[in-house]
Curated annotation (Swiss-Prot):
PANTHER family xref list: LARGE RIBOSOMAL SUBUNIT PROTEIN UL30M, MITOCHONDRIAL RIBOSOMAL PROTEIN L30
Recorded GO MF terms: structural constituent of ribosome
Entry GO terms, CC: cytosolic large ribosomal subunit
Subunit field text: Part of the 50S ribosomal subunit.
Gene Ontology terms describing biological process: translation
Family classification: Belongs to the universal ribosomal protein uL30 family.
Official protein name in the record: Large ribosomal subunit protein uL30
Keyword Disulfide bond in record: no
Length: 63
């Protein structure tokens, strides 16, 4: 159980937000990504995975 809680995912913003839906922009901001090529290491949880799935065309995920 302890190993599962320590899992993280690295998320990188690889496409610009111009011309995207406002909900998708908010999801990217919720992931902590502000500029192009920003990288955040986030805890691997269902909530984070849901945000990533919503904007999968804008981000790159490294497990």
């Amino acid at each position: 159980m302890a190993n599962e809680s320590n899992k993280t995912v690295k998320v990188r913003l690889v496409r610009g937000l111009r011309g995207t839906q406002s909900r998708h922009r908010l999801s990217v901001r919720a992931l902590g990504l502000n500029k192009l090529n920003d990288v955040r290491e986030l805890k691997d949880s269902p909530q984070v995975r849901g945000l990533i799935n919503k904007v999968q065309y804008l981000v790159q995920v490294e497990e």
